[in-house]
Design a protein with these regions (language model features):
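Conserved acetyl-CoA-binding loop-helix of GNAT-fold acetyltransferases
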Residues: 93, 99-114, 121, 131-135, ...
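Terminal substrate-recognition subdomain of acyl/acetyltransferases
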Residues: 1-9, 125-126, 131-190
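Hydrophobic adenine-recognition pocket in adenosine-nucleotide-binding enzymes
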Residues: 16, 93, 126
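Hydrophobic alpha-helical core bundles mediating ligand binding, dimerization, or RNAP-core interactions
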Residues: 25-28, 32
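A short beta-loop-alpha structural element at the N-terminal edge
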Residues: 12-23
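Acetyl-CoA-dependent GNAT
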Residues: 30, 38-88, 94
Length: 190
């Protein structure tokens, strides 16, 4: 898989925790109807998207967020499929922040976490008209399978290495520190 970790200055990609729930709900609530249609592969109301988002961080799997200037602008979700060594990934990027490398950076973190957990294949599904998602899947190195009314991309992962395990561990320490710092109450200096 190509290295896709280059992200714009002022952007932080980290794991999301329950303390990030309100930011995730806000991101989904701010999606326009076309963005919700692309994300859920069908018409979904703002309320339904917000209801999904309220459980996204606590659901089984992992969720990473991309913060631009301290504001959550994108998330990547890694969800087990039930099949051994396989998982599904999904992305939500705020409309004004697409095409800036956030999806690729989130995809790299998701792929590394999945491979280190023993996952061998990641699946990504999107509508044929969602060209940004197809481009992201291609950038991540996925192979495409066309079927019916959706595009199915499969990303084969190599086994973990000592370096990939070490890097994920270091990233995890920084993720926890960044999340704790963001959740810490602000104390005004007098």
């Amino acid at each position: 898989m190509p290295d896709t970790r280059e992200i714009p200055a002022g952007t932080l990609v980290r794991r999301l925790w329950s303390s990030d729930r309100d930011a995730v709900v806000g991101l989904f609530r701010d999606l326009d109807p076309d963005s919700r249609f692309d994300r859920f592969m069908g018409a979904v109301s703002e309320a339904a998207a917000a209801a999904y988002a309220s459980h996204a961080v606590s659901a089984e799997g992992l969720v990473f967020g991309a913060f631009a200037d301290g504001i959550l602008r994108g998330i990547g979700e890694l969800r087990p499929t039930g099949a051994s060594a396989e998982a599904e990934i999904a992305f939500t990027i705020a409309p004004g922040h697409r095409g800036r490398g956030l999806g690729a950076a989130l995809g790299a973190r998701l792929a590394e976490a999945a491979r280190n957990a023993g996952t061998r294949r990641l699946h990504l599904r999107c509508l044929p008209g969602n060209r940004r998602m197809r481009a992201l899947a291609q950038r991540l190195g996925a192979e495409f399978r066309l079927g019916g009314r959706e595009v199915h991309a499969v990303l084969a992962l190599s086994p973990p290495t000592l370096f990939s395990l070490w890097r994920e561990g270091i990233d995890g320490v920084f993720d926890a520190a960044a999340a704790a710092s963001a959740a810490w109450p602000t104390v005004p200096l007098v």
